[in-house]
């Protein structure tokens, strides 16, 4: 992938030009983590960067995703914190581009922020909710809220298309569901190395679950680990997942999914690019952590029930970013992309198919027996 803009443009080029939208991407610099990541009793030497990507259509937020990137000495973790839609995206009768765009964004992050000889992991917990990022968007009748099973399938398709410099191992775990049923949700590949594994990536060399499972904000694994700490319990990694099936997030007849993509370390370091290079490559803008936090918290207090309210909330958020001292007046960080498939492309494809379907005479003339004349 050359850069984020090129990648997103390519991901939707098979869609018609009517599919037009803009996107924005903001992120913060890495700062030392202020809470325990592995060991509850001490602050680990881990660094965190926040990344927020959003899609606009008709000047209103349509979709957004937040990814938290953690750097430890042994692992880079890309934790998908939250993702949500408003229901204000006009597909014009075409397939939705959202899965392809989000896969492209995650692929960009993996390539851009990979570190030399250090493995990377994408981590995600999915649970169906009416809204995550956009308050009151659940009141919009146009918003299609995926149920628990639909959401698991949606994320499996998104993550299945994520590409790093090397192919990842892909893990999915649905607490309380047996492996055979779980794998029915996953995309299947002719190359079995590309198929999903029912399980988790955490390998224990005698350590307890609390020593090898990182802690993330607003994450059910973290809540369970904290509960175990308060109760003074130490459990193995296998016991941890066995008990997780009985946690509040995983019961009441609804399924939840835990996903992990494991990318091996490589000999290239993607973190050497400077901020200036990122701006030239149209790869988003870095802003101050305080501004990021202010914008994010304002988002969670906004109203996205109607299109007009969504436009107003979107404009306020973008103005807050533009008015910060981190943004130069000349920087155009909101990028517009469109599908490129035309009616001529469709016609040409139809002609190609009809040509393939034409019968072809493959008989040799010498093999055709001529009918003898009657005497």
UniProtKB/Swiss-Prot annotation:
N6-acetyllysine: modified positions: 221
Keyword Nucleus: yes
EC number: 2.3.1.48
Gene Ontology molecular-function annotations: histone H3K56 acetyltransferase activity
Intracellular or extracellular location(s): Nucleus
Catalytic activity: L-lysyl-[protein] + acetyl-CoA = N(6)-acetyl-L-lysyl-[protein] + CoA + H(+); L-lysyl-[histone] + acetyl-CoA = N(6)-acetyl-L-lysyl-[histone] + CoA + H(+)
Residues that bind acetyl-CoA: 125, 144-146, 154
Pfam assignment, any one: HAT_KAT11
Entry superkingdom: Eukaryota
Keyword tRNA processing: no
Active-site residues per Swiss-Prot or TrEMBL entry: 219 (proton donor/acceptor)
Annotated phenotype, changing residue 219 to A: Mildly decreases histone acetyltransferase activity
Similarity-based family: Belongs to the RTT109 family.
Protein name as annotated: Histone acetyltransferase Rtt109
Organism expressing this protein natively: Pneumocystis carinii
């Amino acid at each position: 992938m050359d850069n984020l803009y090129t990648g997103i443009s390519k991901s939707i080029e098979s869609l018609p030009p009517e599919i037009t939208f803009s996107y924005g991407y903001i992120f913060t610099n890495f700062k030392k983590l202020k809470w325990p990541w592995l060991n509850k009793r001490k602050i680990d030497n881990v660094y965190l960067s926040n990344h927020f990507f959003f899609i606009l259509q008709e000047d209103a937020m349509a979709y957004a995703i937040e990814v938290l990137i953690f750097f430890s000495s042994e692992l880079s973790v890309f934790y998908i914190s939250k993702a949500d839609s408003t229901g204000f995206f006009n597909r014009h009768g075409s397939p939705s581009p959202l899965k392809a765009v989000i896969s492209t964004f995650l692929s960009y992050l993996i390539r851009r922020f990979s570190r030399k000889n250090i493995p990377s992991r994408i981590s995600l917990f999915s649970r169906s909710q009416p809204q995550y990022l956009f308050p009151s968007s659940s009141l919009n009748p146009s918003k299609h809220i995926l149920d628990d099973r639909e959401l698991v399938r949606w994320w499996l398709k998104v993550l299945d298309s994520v590409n790093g410099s090397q192919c990842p191992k892909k893990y999915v775990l649905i607490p309380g569901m047996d492996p055979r049923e779980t794998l029915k949700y996953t995309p299947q590949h002719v190359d079995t190395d590309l198929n999903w594994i029912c399980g988790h990536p955490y390998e224990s060399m005698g350590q307890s679950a609390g020593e090898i499972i990182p802690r993330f904000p607003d994450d059910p694994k973290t809540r369970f680990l904290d509960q175990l700490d308060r109760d003074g319990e130490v459990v193995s990694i296998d016991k941890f997942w066995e008990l997780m099936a009985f946690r509040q997030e995983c019961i009441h007849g609804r399924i939840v999914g835990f996903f992990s993509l494991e990318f091996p370390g490589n000999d290239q370091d993607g973190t050497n690019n400077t901020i200036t290079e990122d701006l030239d490559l149209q790869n988003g803008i870095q802003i101050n952590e305080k501004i990021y936090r202010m914008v994010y918290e304002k988002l969670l207090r906004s109203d996205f029930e109607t299109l007009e309210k969504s436009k107003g909330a979107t404009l306020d958020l973008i103005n807050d970013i533009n008015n910060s001292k981190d943004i130069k007046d000349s920087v155009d960080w909101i990028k517009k992309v469109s599908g490129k498939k035309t009616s001529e492309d469709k016609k040409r494809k139809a002609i190609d198919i009809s040509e393939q379907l034409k019968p072809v005479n493959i008989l040799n003339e010498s093999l055709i027996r001529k009918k003898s004349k009657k005497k």
